[in-house]
Amino acid sequence: MTTIRKNHPLFKAANSALIDLPAPASLSSLWNFGSLLGLCLISQIATGLFLAMHYAPETSSAFASVAHICRDVNYGWLIRNMHANGASFFFVCIYIHIGRGLYYGSYLYKETWNIGVVLLLLVMMTAFVGYVLPWGQMSFWGATVITNLLSAVPYIGESLVQWLWGGFAVDNATLTRFFAFHFLLPFVILALTLIHLIFLHETGSNNPLGLPSNSDKIPFHPYYTIKDIFGFLVLLFTLISLALFAPNLLGDPDNFTPANSMVTPAHIKPEWYFLFAYAILRSIPNKLGGVIALLCSILVLLVVPILHTSKHRSLTFRPVTQFLFWLLIADVLVLTWIGGMPVEAPYIITGQIASALYFSLFLILMPMASWVENKMLTW
């Protein structure tokens, strides 16, 4: 069996990635979230495939087809709830995964980090087009508002929006192409995930100390496979519990109303996992400025490796930057809260302060703190 595992052209690739892979001995549970993201992706593709078998991507029947799935298809309600709430769990895992990368300096593996940022953008795009498919009020108006941001692009903006819509408004052509994108993109994400892993296995994993661990490695199986399986069980138990006991907890009540272009909801907002970026978009009073800020809220992650000035890799031994890191986490939570609030005082000014702090932490405060800590090492 060992000979087949190590010599067979197919099995030896899996063996070197999942069984005999040398891994640092000190990885904490924060390193579980990469494999949990893989589980979320497989779960979303599986449930999405079954939903696509019964879904009708047509404006007159899309809303009814989702109701049909929940009422008439065997376990359709469970598949739909698993898929809708699975997206939320996907983003929880992504944000913790990125937070771990920022805290422990994993971004210094630049190729892996950059592919990860591209993956984040693709997952966000997939989730956005997926949210439009049930064709409820928030689906329709969310699609209208967010796609309309392209009109801020100078000179070609209006043409871009009409090209994306397939007409002069969000309508049947838009829904059909969004369904096509939502079906296709997860497979692109799957391919990029493999590239992400290939780059990771070129360098090996980072560890909580941020120190080279070449002298202290253990085989991935059985130590980390058991740890990952435990993580899988916790995630699946939590996801199934949410899907069974509170399936609509994270959704928007407006999406239970079929899309109506003549009635605008009182407060248009995206799903909770986009609210921090939505708050940054709204905090700029200029349309083009808001779109640029929205893009930069994600693309700022690409600048993090360039601005790393510390002599230490991880934040484990850097108390000043640690404080700023937790300030960033608090700031993102505040932005998430603001994104769900109406555009009125005191939320406007709070959102603007939180947005300014978000970019300041990444671009100014954290690099400055690293410089101060480097000086402190020489005292």
Swiss-Prot record:
| Residues holding a ubiquinone | H201
Protein name according to UniProt: Cytochrome b
Q: Which UniProt keywords apply?
A: Electron transport, Heme, Iron, Membrane, Metal-binding, Mitochondrion, Mitochondrion inner membrane, Respiratory chain, Transmembrane, Transmembrane helix, Transport, Ubiquinone
Q: Tell me the residue numbers annotated for binding heme b b562.
A: H83, H182
* Gene name of the record: mt-cyb
An example Gene Ontology CC term for this record: respiratory chain complex III
Entry's family note: Belongs to the cytochrome b family.
Cited CDD domains: cytochrome_b_C (cd00290), Cytochrome_b_N (cd00284)
Annotated heme b b566 binding sites: H97, H196
Which biological process terms from the Gene Ontology are attached to this UniProt entry?
mitochondrial electron transport, ubiquinol to cytochrome c
Q: Where in the cell is it found?
A: Mitochondrion inner membrane
